[in-house]
From Swiss-Prot:
Disordered: region residues: 1-103
Designated gene of the protein: IFT43
Assigned protein family: Belongs to the IFT43 family.
Oligomeric and partner information: Component of the IFT complex A (IFT-A) complex.
Protein name: Intraflagellar transport protein 43 homolog
This protein's UniProt keywords: Cell projection, Cilium biogenesis/degradation, Cytoplasm, Cytoskeleton
Function per UniProt: As a component of IFT complex A (IFT-A), a complex required for retrograde ciliary transport and entry into cilia of G protein-coupled receptors (GPCRs), it is involved in ciliogenesis. Involved in retrograde ciliary transport along microtubules from the ciliary tip to the base.
Species of origin: Taeniopygia guttata (Zebra finch)
Keyword Ribosomal protein: no
GO biological process: cilium assembly; intraciliary retrograde transport
Listed Basic and acidic residues bias regions: 1-12, 75-85
Length: 204
């Protein structure tokens, strides 16, 4: 109750300069008054050491330029980032070890590709056995050696057709020519069938 009249009398005493302080300033004045009262107390005069003060952080979230929402804080953060990028770019430009060296055309020797021959590909192919190889394999077996010169192949040769009858000449096919040949063969077969039917009908 006593503090209220003192606050009311403060503007009367000091005028405009003695206006009550609000917020952080008022807390600082209160802490200063408490420190003075502790120093003047009899415990301080007896030599008792006051407890150590906890570390006090100066400033607040507004002091961080990166996290500040104001335009000035953003500009400051952008300037810091630009400064870092500029330093890196200058350091990279000073270092000449990463720059590749391009040779001149005179130093490059033209390779003669015409004289170079590519190696043939190695492909595994199953070799076909010839008759000579087959005869050698046949002679290895002792069971077939007794038949040498005694085998009669006349029955087999009677059934086999000669080579010139099996091979056909390469003839180019024409649509009109093929059509006429097929149609003529069909007509001849039809005529033969008709004549055979007439013969069967005429017989009693």
């Amino acid at each position: 109750m006593e503090a209220e009249p003192e606050r009311a009398e403060a503007p009367r005493r000091g005028g405009v300069a003695a206006v009550l302080k609000m917020g952080r300033r008022a807390r600082q004045d209160i802490f200063a008054g408490e420190n003075l009262s502790r120093k003047n107390s009899p415990s301080a005069s007896l030599g008792e050491v006051p407890p150590p003060k906890p570390p006090r952080r100066q400033g607040g979230w507004a002091d961080d330029p990166v996290l500040a929402p104001t335009k000035s804080g953003r500009k400051h953060a952008e300037e810091v980032e630009d400064h870092r990028l500029r330093q890196q770019s200058l350091e990279a430009s000073d270092d000449g070890g990463d720059i590749p060296v391009i040779p001149d055309l005179e130093d490059v020797q033209d390779e003669d590709l015409a004289m170079q021959v590519a190696a043939p590909p190695s492909v595994q192919v199953n070799r076909v056995l010839t008759y000579h190889d087959l005869d050698k394999d046949l002679m290895k077996y002792a069971a077939f050696q007794t038949l040498d010169g005694e085998v009669d192949l006349k029955l087999l040769t009677k059934v086999l057709a000669p080579e010139h009858e099996l091979r056909e000449d390469d003839v180019s096919w024409d649509w009109d020519h093929l059509f006429t040949e097929v149609s003529s063969e069909l007509v001849t077969e039809w005529d033969l069938g008709q004549s055979e039917r007439e013969d069967h009908i005429s017989l009693p």
